[in-house]
């Protein structure tokens, strides 16, 4: 076959052949013609440009009629030539005898024989594309578009916020359906058919207060969210208003580790049979985790709604408060789930006040005789309002759970607590001291991995001790305390040095000077002093804390003590008012 492609040559002629072969009108049946593509300038040789190229055989398959388009231009020549080919080749000429054949006998003669350079692929693309076919680059297209007006941007942001709100409502419907599978499925079936003897009395642990959560969302909260579709401004008030009601999620999460343990015992037998009987796709454990996931999801959706609502130029003050609420409640839920995995503590954790913080420290604990151990141990430390608990993390989950568990090791009551900060100038180290009923001192040295963690704990512990100190001072001298508070408020400045400042709490040399003089050193006297001696026991503390305070006039009316509560503790107390 003529013009066959030889190995090692450029593939450009083959590309041209494939493109031209798709247009059957360009060739007469049985005709053969040789085309030669020019070099880098993009022009076409005379054999192709004229439309009546020199024939490859003794007679031409095409006649040089007046319909020939003539030599095309350097860029769009090939396209113009293709556009006129159908008209030019409409009259089929006589083919040489024995030369006629199907389209597969066509062959384009490469220009390699003439020594001409073949064009690059980019040039071929330019030839095949007409000047009107070129697509504008994205950058130029973006620049050419007129920037959106501020009103259009706000409109789009508002539309996106409504999309987030719609997603919130739709996912709420799905959430209620999932809770219904538990309450109207598992719980109703177990109540009707009874439970195995080994599970009797423990079925309430499995479900906790999930029925209460389900009924509230089904009968009230879902309808309120649907109302927000017509009145989006109501969304923020909805979450702020029901902050206390959302405390039921904290109760549920506190019970969740116990529920996981019971379900793990019966999940492969009894609960699996119930699932097949009810025809549910999800297992019971997958449904029981839905409330935990949902309380986290509210936070994410509210943040997205706040972002777009703010871009739309709407008032977002209430929304920011709602986001703050829904960031706080999930944190409390997570804390309660962690506490549910604490084992070995004799007493009720719920009676120790709110969990204010938890972190992992390298702790040097006291041994027999009050001396510090020669080596430290890794401990998970929990800070409550009334107690500090030291625990050891277990390698695996507790009683079949997937999350890490903790075993109680030691504790310090806040009423016996003292604080020493920045030991030996190290911002990562501080000490907590505990005074026993017989006056003995136990000292725990804590070292954090990050100075920020250590300083945060020093601040939180100091704040607790300061609040307790103020409360005791108010009990001992309510008139003087009230007068001091009135003077502070009238001057419009904070009441004394801030938490962790040298004026209130000596975290430097004074704290290191006497390891047996904790900041709250006089508090244990409340446990030992008989009635009537409390005031005398607290007198040194009162003088140290309050200094020289002017005496109140004798005719001053008695004022009841009003110890202040930090805002964060006030919010915690608000959540703890259980109206469920």
UniProtKB/Swiss-Prot annotation:
Residues 48-76, 128-157, 482-524, 545-580 are annotated as: Disordered. Pfam families: RhoGEF, SOS1_NGEF_PH. Disulfide bonds: none annotated. Keywords: Cell membrane, Cytoplasm, Guanine-nucleotide releasing factor, Membrane. Residues 509-520 have a biased composition (Polar residues). Its main location: membrane. Residues 348-466 form the PH domain. This is Rho guanine nucleotide exchange factor 25. The lineage of its organism: Eukaryota, Metazoa, Chordata, Craniata, Vertebrata. The gene is ARHGEF25.
